[in-house]
Amino acid sequence: VISLGFDATPAIALVSRLGTAGDDGYLFIGYGGPSSSVRAKPARQAILEFFSGLAAHGVDVKVDFVEAVGNPDLDVPELALRLADAGVVEFYVLGGMRYHAVLLYVVSQVLPGESAFYVTNEATMDLVRFPVQKMRDLREGRVDVLRALLEGPTTERRLALLSDRSQSRVSRILKELVAAGLVEGPDPHKYRLTGLGRAYLALRGR
């Protein structure tokens, strides 16, 4: 089962790229803030028509809209149970990660540590793999460096000052965070948070 948080156009584009060979089916979880295109009827209709087409070609498709993020009444345990019951083992996440903190929480609580989710770079549509266990294992030192990036793109030297760590230590941490998809850089000399990094900090209460 593949789970997607999405806006309509990139969701369709990504699934077209993924193909269908060997997949058991798709569980689609559409959610976002009030402006999310997932809530718009045309977007729903386009997605439903697309996956109806897949179903017509023999692909087992399940479409399930859950408008979750931004909803103060969201029952996270209920959502987690629905995902677990659906047999989710990998997530493919679309769009701005600022909307996806709930999804990341569910992933970290429900999926086994060897599972993974993939975050999509909106500009290139490339997929970044992020193991669930790595999310659980990030220690406080790494979180301090992430927090130091909240104010905007920052150099390695300034990050060392802001996080009260040696520059060599910060350099090693940054390499791990870049590999995990939480930080981008250096470009050319500064590092910046990715949407996934911001969502992770939201999970940790910053």
Model-predicted regions and their roles:
Residues V88-L94:
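Short glycine-rich phosphate-binding loop at a beta-alpha junction
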Residues V1-V88, V102-Y105, Q109-R206:
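Long, low-complexity, Lys/Arg-enriched
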